[in-house]
Structure formats: C-alpha cells, structure tokens
Swiss-Prot record:
One of its GO terms (cellular component) is cytoplasm. The gene is gapA. Keywords: Cytoplasm, Glycolysis, NAD, Nucleotide-binding, Oxidoreductase. This is Glyceraldehyde-3-phosphate dehydrogenase. GO terms for biological process: glucose metabolic process; glycolytic process. It catalyses: D-glyceraldehyde 3-phosphate + phosphate + NAD(+) = (2R)-3-phospho-glyceroyl phosphate + NADH + H(+). It comes from Buchnera aphidicola subsp. Baizongia pistaciae (strain Bp).
Length: 333
C-alpha cells in the first residue's frame, strides 16, 4: 500500500520530512502547498545548511516540480479549503505551517478532500496527540491528530520506560534546545516573550515549554507529575532533555540504565537509543530516533532520585515520527 501525502507548509519540518520520505518506498509525496514559488521551493529543498545537499534529482519543467522523476504538485493557497486534495486522493496531509493548530482549522483539509491530517505541533485545543512508543495503541481512527512536539517525543518514551518499571512520583524537565526559525538573529520586538526577542546568536535564552505537561496527555498516569522549562541556545540543530525524577521504587542508576538499554533493543527499538560513548550534540545530527539516552551524562543522588539525559535531533527525529504516524493512521479507514 502506497500512502499518498500532501504537505502544507514547507518550512524546516516540511523539508526534512520530504527528504526522509524519499527513503520510504511505501510513501509518496504528491503535493506541496506554500506561499513561495516553485523555483524557491526547489532551491530550499536542494540546499540545506544543517543536513547538506539533497541526495536526488530536482527538475523544474513548465513551472512543475519533479523530484527523482516524480511529479510534485505545487500550489500557493492561503486557505486550505482550496487545496483540492481529493483530486490527488491524498491519504494524509502534513499540516506544518504552524498556523492551523486546532481540529476546526485543520478540518479545512478534510473539506478539500484529504482523508486525514497530522498537525506537526502541539495543538491549541483538545486534538488528540500521539507519540510513537507511548500511545499509538489508543488511536481509534480520528481524522485529525497531532504528533505533539519534538521535545515531547523525546521525553514521553523515556518517562514511560521509567514509570512502567519504577513508578515516577514527580519530576522536573529541562530541554536545552537548538535555535528554531521563530527566533531573532539580532535583538528585535517580541511582545509575548520579551526574552525570546533577544538575539539567538549571542544568548542562552530561558523559555517556556509545554512538553512535560503534554506527557500527561499521552501518558495520563503522569498527569500533574511533570513540568519543565527550556533554554534556547545558539546551536543550529540537536537538543537534549534533562529529566530529574523521584521514583517510588528503589533502584540504582546502573539498574535504571540497564532497563533503558533493554527497551532500546526491544519495545522502543525504533524510538529510544542508548549510548555509553563520550558524545556531544553534533554526533546526533541526522539521527531519526527521538530519544537517545546518554548513560554517562546522568547520575543519581540516591536510589530514588535520579537525573536522566537524552538527546534528540529536533528536526530529523521528529519528522521521522510524523512519517511513522502517517503510516500508522493510514491502516485505519
């Protein structure tokens, strides 16, 4: 079964996801909608400062984009209702504009003929969120879903492994997060977040994150037990979660590492990674796992109170799981 996908919004996630989709024979991207023209879409797809040049053939003929010989329909519609996804029999629309963040707004894609929609951000309403390795089993055919955030995709699988085995009593999370497109290169106006308006090139910027609270939505047993903050740092890609928890069951740090290592080779094999190497952030650039546990970076105060460190490529890891979710929901009518 070939899954036919349309992308609405060709930003960082849209482009990285497009690249990763080329490696999956069961996924075909048939259309891209963005406000930029086909020439600029081709340029941004071909060249990437973080992930390098596109490994494939890109051709424009008569204002039409062809990638590796396959035609990609390019449109420039502001209103998703006008996208005519039905003409291409689109199975899943990847809603990656960062604008249509509710079921009501994203339903316009359904009205345009798409069968299902994945929002690539935490929703601003009660649209259900699904995280691979955590709650895919709760999907029952909803037409519009969210893949949560990149940080939630790192934190939730790790928290699930720990909670299932040791029962988390409470915890705090910090994500040290690479720069994203919403930040300013030099100091600028940011009424909603004054610190967020400061130069991303020169500062470590304290910020908020809903990732820890979102874990309580995909793992209800942890609802109200986790919260956290973020620091935006001047690196281009790859982020890291620092999770400090108090567990009910006693275990040494070494015991906990072994449980995570086991999960990385079994139930969480394509989600969680495990390393004992002396790694740094750039070592994970391009990694499609969403939570790579760093055994040498964590520690414990005692047998109930531990600090866990897990890396994630906030672009590739997340985008790969959007594709996984696309494959999964397409098996439901």
């Amino acid at each position: 079964m070939t899954i036919k996908i349309g992308i609405n919004g060709f930003g960082r996630i849209g482009r990285v996801l497009f690249r990763l989709a080329q490696l999956r024979s069961n996924i075909e991207i048939l259309a891209i909608n963005d406000l930029i023209n086909v020439q600029y879409i081709a340029y941004m797809l071909k060249y990437d400062s973080i992930h390098g040049n596109f490994n494939g053939k890109i051709v424009i003929k008569n204002e039409t984009l062809f990638v590796n010989g396959k035609k990609i329909r390019i449109t420039n519609e502001k209103d998703p209702k006008n996208l005519m996804w039905g003409d291409l029999n689109i199975d899943v629309v990847i809603e990656s504009t960062g604008i249509f963040l509710t079921t009501e707004d994203s339903y316009k894609h359904i009205q345009a003929g798409a069968k299902k929609v994945i929002i690539t951000s935490p929703p601003k309403d009660n649209t259900p969120m699904f995280v691979r390795g955590v709650n895919f089993n709760e999907y029952v055919g909803q037409k519009i879903v969210s893949n949560a955030s990149c940080t939630t995709n790192c934190l939730a699988p790790l928290a699930k492994v720990i909670n299932d085995e040791f029962e988390i009593v409470e915890g705090l999370m910090t994500t040290v997060h690479a720069t994203t497109a919403t930040q300013k290169t030099v100091d600028g106006v940011s009424y909603k977040d004054w610190r967020g308006g400061r130069s991303a090139l020169q500062n470590i910027i304290p910020s908020t994150t809903g990732a820890a609270r979102a874990v309580g939505k995909v793992l209800p047993e942890l609802n109200g037990k986790l919260t956290g903050i973020a620091f935006r740092i001047p690196t281009a890609n790859v982020s890291v979660v620092d999770l400090t928890v108090r567990n009910k069951k006693i275990a040494t740090y070494e015991d906990i590492c072994q449980i995570i290592k086991y999960a990385s080779n079994h139930d969480m094999k394509e989600v969680i990674g495990y390393t004992e190497d002396h790694v740094v952030s750039s070592d994970f650039n391009g990694n499609t796992l969403t939570s790579i546990f760093d055994a040498k970076a964590g520690l414990s105060l005692n047998n109930n109170f531990i600090k866990l460190v897990s890396w994630y490529d906030n672009e590739c890891g997340y985008s790969s799981k959007v594709l996984d979710l696309s494959e999964f929901i397409s098996t439901f009518s």
